[in-house]
Amino acid sequence: MTFSTSSSFSRRALVALLVCTLLIDLSSFTDARPQDDPTSVAEAIRLLQELETKHAQHARPRFGKRSYLNPAGYGQDEQEDDWQDSTFTR
């Protein structure tokens, strides 16, 4: 009988722990709702504009990362006629 009592207690403890964990997890969802405060909207717009300017400063186009199989198709300089020459190297 001692074995079944401890098994029942551990199941109850496990269920209680699960319920407490779910309650704590569900209580965090209340903070995720958006606010209709105009200052928070203005702050979000300002942060997005700042992010856009930082991205524009640090993002670089990917020139020179493609092969020379078809330079006209990749926007390479068409004046380079020697791209097909086997001795041509960059």
UniProtKB/Swiss-Prot annotation:
> Could you tell me the keywords of this UniProt record?
Amidation, Cleavage on pair of basic residues, Digestion, Hormone, Neuropeptide, Secreted, Signal
Q: Which residues are processed away as propeptide to yield the mature protein? A: 67-90
Q: Where is this region: Disordered?
A: 54-90
Signal peptide, first to last residue: 1-27
Modification Phenylalanine amide, positions:
F63
Domain of life, per the record? Answer: Eukaryota
Q: Carries keyword Cell division? A: no
As one GO molecular function, the record gives:
hormone activity
User: Major place of localization?
Assistant: secreted
Q: Subcellular location, in the record's words?
A: Secreted
Q: GO CC terms for this protein?
A: extracellular region
Task: Describe tissue expression.
Answer: Expressed in hemolymph, brain and midgut.
Annotated family: Belongs to the NPY family.
Q: What does this protein do?
A: An integral part of the sensory system that mediates food signaling, providing the neural basis for the regulation of food response; coordinates larval foraging and social behavior changes during development. May have a hormonal role in females.
Name of the protein described by the UniProt record: Neuropeptide F
